[in-house]
Structure formats: structure tokens, C-alpha cells
Amino acid sequence: MKTLIHVALLASLAAPLAWSAGTVKVYTPDSEKPKTLTHAEHLLDLVGQPRLANSWWPGAVIAERQKTAEAEQQHKALLARLTGLAEQEDGDDAAAINSVRQQLQTLKVTGRQNVNLDPDEVRVTEKGNPTLEGEYTLWLPVKPTTVTVMGLISSPGKKPFTPGRDVASYLDEQSLLSGADNSYAWVVYPDGHTQKAPVAYWNKRHIEPMPGSIIFVGFADHFWTKAYDGLNADILHSLIQRIPE
């Protein structure tokens, strides 16, 4: 009897582990409809799939369902904040804020997880192969051939990527809108990390974005009131959380 109880106890302990294994919807460039992977207990069970071997991992994004709901609410709050700020301004200032809001409205965000998805790194990095519990979505984009410029600039959008070209030169053809930071821009790389790039004549550094990066020109701290505190950081957060195209 003790043996039977012991076996039953082990079974009851094992059941939640099997139940908690991740379910992942995988979007690949060759199909509009996602494929579903079930019973993925660790990250390597997902990214180590042979069918994904040729994926462009620097731009891959994995998101968790509950975190996605949070990210969507945060992005919605950001858009509402920009709307409110624009209503408090007029003229060129209001137009600049509305331009940024319109650019951000086109973004779709998700609950991006801060994890390296390159299978080689997952295999060898300490704590690089975390467990998967719950519902996830993985996006695997085609390697882009463009860089996106956005923010308080005259002509936001995609620009052809040119090897060796630095952040400042991508902005040379732009006019800055009212209240823009004319000394620094932010680079949001496809893997989600960011870098502050000096772009003025007095502090310029040669920083090259990679294909798929976003160059963001934000609000100048000295120009705006304290109502704008943290706004650039909130915008960068949404850009990091964007769903790849």
C-alpha cells in the first residue's frame, strides 16, 4: 500500500510540470498563419527546432500572453498621454507631438521577453535556456534591408540600409520638428537593446545601426515642462516591444 501511495504522489507532482509546459504560436516568413508547438518545456525545445535553423535570430521576438496584455495597455496609455499633451500646446509644438503620436499609432506591441533567442547562445549560456510555462508567440522576420527613422523629424519612415552609414547621416536629410533633441538620437536594435547616439556637430560619434533598427529622435529635456518627464523612455519601451514586420 505504501508503494502505491508513493507512486501516486510522484504522479501528482509530475502532472503540473507536464501541464505547465509552454504552448507557442510561431510566425515564420513563409506563412501568414502561425504554426503551433506544444509541450515546449525549455526555450531550446523551441529555437532548436530543425525547421527554424535558417531563421534570422537577431530580429526574432518571443512574447508571453499576460505580458502582451500589459504592453498593450502601456502603449494605449502612452498614446492617450500624447493626445493630452498635444491638447495643451498649440502651433508647431502641438503639430510635433501629434506627428509622434501618429507614428506610434501604427505600431503593434507585444509582451517581449528579454532573452537571447540564438540557439547557439541558448545552448551554451548559463541560464540561457529557461523553462517555458504558459502561452507564447514567436515572430521570425525576414532580415530587413531598411532602417526606420522616426520621432520629431520631418520625414519619418523606412530608409534603405547602407553599410558603413552612421546614425547622424541617416538624419542629415531630415528637418527637426519643434522641441526635438538636436544633440542625441536613440537606436533601437532588432534584438531590443538601445543605444544613445550623439549626433550634433560638437559631440558626434560614428555609430552604425544594423538592418531593421529604429532611429528615434526624441523630445529635448530642456525645451519641455516636467509634464514630459519620462516620455522618451515610455516611447522607447513601446519601440522595444514592437512586433517585427
Label for each model-derived stretch:
Residues 19-245:
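Ser/Thr/Pro/Gly-biased, low-complexity, turn-/loop-rich segments
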Residues 2-10:
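Sec-dependent signal peptide recognition
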Residues 10-13, 190:
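A general, composition-driven signal for non-globular sequence regions
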Residues 15-17:
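N-terminal signal peptide c-region/cleavage motif recognized by signal peptidases
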